[in-house]
Amino acid sequence: MMLKYLVLFIVLSISVHAQNYPQFNATVYDSSGTGYYFLVPIKMGPQGANFNPYHMILDSVGNVVYYKEFVSGLNTGDFKLLSNGLMTYTYLNKYYLMDSSFTILDSVNCKNGIQHDGHDMQITANGEYLLMGSENVVMDLSSYYLFNNNGSPGSSTASVKAVVVQIQDVNKNVIFEWHSKDY
């Protein structure tokens, strides 16, 4: 008898913990819509340190169908459904790929010293990864008079974060790299 109550208590505790997602209001303007909404709220700046980022999928009327919380102070993003049916998100300098049961199948990140940029990742029809990255470069911006809201010239040794687009094959070998600093 005691074992039955212990099992019931454990099951109830787990289900209560699973409902630990933040409260929100969903206003539905057109109930004829179908589909799902992928949400990734983030906080920027010092106040973000006490915020637990999360992924959430809502159905067309605002019911939670998926929720995953991440470590406080570390942002996640770009949570989406790809055209091949996989879901992807960025976290800790990688993109993770999940199937429809939310099982992580693989991860991919930029190579050749390129820094991870979590703004976009796509997979082509033939399985190649298109990744967005960045690199820090020093540039002479002294001929540009756009700075400090008063037309001041830029620095001759300005530190600039430049975009890099990287394409990797199915084995994650870099097959193409485009550097915005070159254009």
Language model features with spans:
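Sec-dependent N-terminal signal peptides
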Residues: 3-14
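Histidine-/acidic-rich catalytic cores in large beta-rich domains
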Residues: 18-183
